[in-house]
Amino acid sequence: MTATLRKLYHSNVVTAVGSALAEFYIRFVIRTSRVVRDPPDTDGKLFSQHPQIFAMWHGQFMMVPAIRPQADTDIAIIVSRHGDAEILANTIQRFGMRVVRGAGAGRRRKDRGGAAALRGALRALKDGATFALTADAPPGPARKAGIGIALLAKLSGRPIVPCAMATNRYVALNSWSAFTLNLPFSKLAIVVGDPIVVPEGAGSIELEATRLAVEQGLNEVTQRAYGLGRREGSSRLSYAAWGTPKRSDAVMAPGRADYPAPAWVRSNATNTL
């Protein structure tokens, strides 16, 4: 990208237009989709111990506004300091959520940004805001929780709640997290897992156990979310990368989703989706 194009891409006009389009598209997906919840009262479970720490996988991050928090509930979300994240930050703010800036590019900047993000997350939780973040982060590996979320729970004393938002129709992008672009006119599943609490005075062993529990909890709720998207007797169309559709099976077995879950979900599932 040339300097001129980079400057244009990071301009206030492009950021404003891009975030407005992103907000419109996400609202369009939500409003044209049939929402199913597990448990039925997801708000009650999500906010029973407010403020909490919402955890999700990066690949299923797009539909986080579908959680639809109560009007008087403050939610903060971490966003990278990288210039490319400005549209994302503005989009989140358009949904009435607070933004906490995380790490930027480069190792030293990432280290400084990570410490600043942790301080910002602690301040948000102390102020009474539920804090949402992806347990995995670029450049990966995908679906491997970092120790930071366990440390945040320890320092704040707040529980971690695994969440998943998935649609049965989507495009999986060819990115490090296989980020899913959710499509309109879908079945949108919102699944909330059980809270994970870090023991008081936890050491490195307990923090690692918490990290593994977050991974397991997120894999479970994500599998359940895609399982709720089943439809019978439909053709199966999967996307290996953006704009590269390929037919994987002519006809699906009854009871499965018309758009299958991502390959990593299917390979980790204990039950057939």
Which positions does each model-derived feature cover?
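Short gly/pro/ser/thr-enriched loop/turn and capping motifs at secondary-structure boundaries
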Residues: 84-86, 107-108, 141, 167-172
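C-terminal functional extensions of proteins
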Residues: 195, 202-226
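Residue-level preference for the first positions of well-ordered beta-strands
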Residues: 51-55, 74, 128-132
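Membrane-anchoring hydrophobic helices of lipid-metabolizing enzymes
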Residues: 1-69, 90, 96-98, 215-216, ...
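A cross-family acyltransferase "interaction/gating" segment
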Residues: 143-204
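Catalytic-site beta-strand/loop segments enriched in glycine and acidic/polar residues
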Residues: 118-152, 156
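Membrane-interfacial amphipathic helices and adjacent loop/beta segments
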Residues: 16-37, 76-123
